Amino acid sequence: MDQLKKPHILLCNDDGIEGEGLHALAASMKKIGNITVVAPAEPHSGMSHAMTLGTPLRIKKYYKNNRFFGYTVSGTPVDCVKVALSQILPSKPDLLVSGINYGSNTATNTLYSGTVAAALEGAIQGITSLAFSLATYENADFSYAAKFARKLSKKVLTEGLPPDTILSVNIPNIPESEIQGILVTEQGRSRWEEDAIERHDVYGNPYYWLNGTLMLLDTSLQHDEYAVRKHYVAVTPISCDFTNRDFMGSLEQWNLKK
């Protein structure tokens, strides 16, 4: 990237164009580059890497306080990245930043996350990409998260990332003075103990709300969720490649036949 030119930064999320974290991120990232915001028209949390097939997508301009803010896409976070690259941007951006998500995306939740998926789609398309998430579902304060997103983005623009790799960053929802430090972490293991809540409509037909408790299986500071719970910022390199190479040798010994 030309050091004399401001970087072009694509911003997206999964909480939708009105997401508070997206607006905090945009205000922060404007200080280091030229931004384009492309986000879902509606919240799409938990969509993972879903994309829309068989249904047309629509792009609309979005205004905040009568000023142009960005574009909405009537689809998923991954749709937003694909549409941004093919229909909105004249060329690939220097950086893609997804977030700031309302709620952490650590451990197994990484697989469910539309925020992380948008960044992974960027990496698949050859764009240096980051995902940021704030570990709370209430009383969110995005000020430090937005500040750290800007700081890390500047570093990544200088240093770069390996191919097909993103950084997924999870930040505690506490004042900056209480942050214990920054840790490079692994994706931890966790499991949801599901508890679907049954309700009935006015006709007596049952419907269900998915609910559950996240059970943490890794409890050391080298793992993302535990680190965040101990008031550290967790920076986790995530790869697009899901291959379990440690098991390949054992699998080959099965001598599978056609």
UniProtKB/Swiss-Prot annotation:
A divalent metal cation binds at D14, D15, S45, N101. It holds the Pfam family SurE. SUPFAM superfamilies: SurE-like. It catalyses: a ribonucleoside 5'-phosphate + H2O = a ribonucleoside + phosphate. Gene3D superfamilies: Survival protein SurE-like phosphatase/nucleotidase. Binds 1 divalent metal cation per subunit. GO terms for molecular function: 3'-nucleotidase activity; 5'-nucleotidase activity; exopolyphosphatase activity; metal ion binding; nucleotide binding. It is an enzyme of class 3 (hydrolase). The keyword ATP-binding does not apply. It is found in: Cytoplasm. Its EC number is 3.1.3.5. Belongs to the SurE nucleotidase family. Nucleotidase that shows phosphatase activity on nucleoside 5'-monophosphates. This is 5'-nucleotidase SurE. It comes from Chlorobium phaeobacteroides (strain DSM 266 / SMG 266 / 2430). The gene is surE.
